[in-house]
Design a protein with these regions (language model features):
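N-terminal presequence-like segments and the immediate start of the first folded domain
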Residues: 1-71, 77-124
Length: 124
């Protein structure tokens, strides 16, 4: 088993890995819209979604996977009004991949967080 970290302070504080690879599977924890290099959070949901997807792509690459290997995605948004706003980012990232997907409207742990995306990838 391989554990992957992005160095986010949340990983150490909350005791989790950004991703865990086991066999042909890669489980990527929920990723919020921070630019984890600067810890800056954009205000707009679309910008947050794009940051989430960029972080996910980087994590998958470091694990030996790619976006094309994603088989499941869960989106968590704090406001259903943000759904339309993030659709362009989702269509660009997943339009050709078409993983199984769930979208949930729920609160997140910080008030500035509008979007969280979690994925599972498989190479078999």
């Amino acid at each position: 088993m391989k554990r992957i970290s992005t160095g986010s302070p949340f990983e150490a504080t909350m005791g989790y890995s950004r991703a865990v690879v086991k066999g042909g599977w890669c489980f990527v924890s929920g990723v919020t819209g921070y630019d984890y290099k600067t810890m800056v959070m954009p205000e707009k949901a679309l910008d947050q979604a794009q940051n989430c997807l960029s972080t996910i792509a980087d994590v998958l690459k470091s694990a030996g996977f790619g976006m094309q290997d994603i088989v499941r995605v869960q989106y968590t948004l704090i406001d259903r009004e943000d759904v339309e706003a993030i659709l362009p980012a989702l269509a660009t990232a997943f339009g050709d991949i078409r993983p199984a997907a769930t979208m949930v409207i729920a609160g997140l742990i910080r008030p500035e967080m509008r979007v969280e995306i979690e994925v599972t990838a498989f190479k078999g």
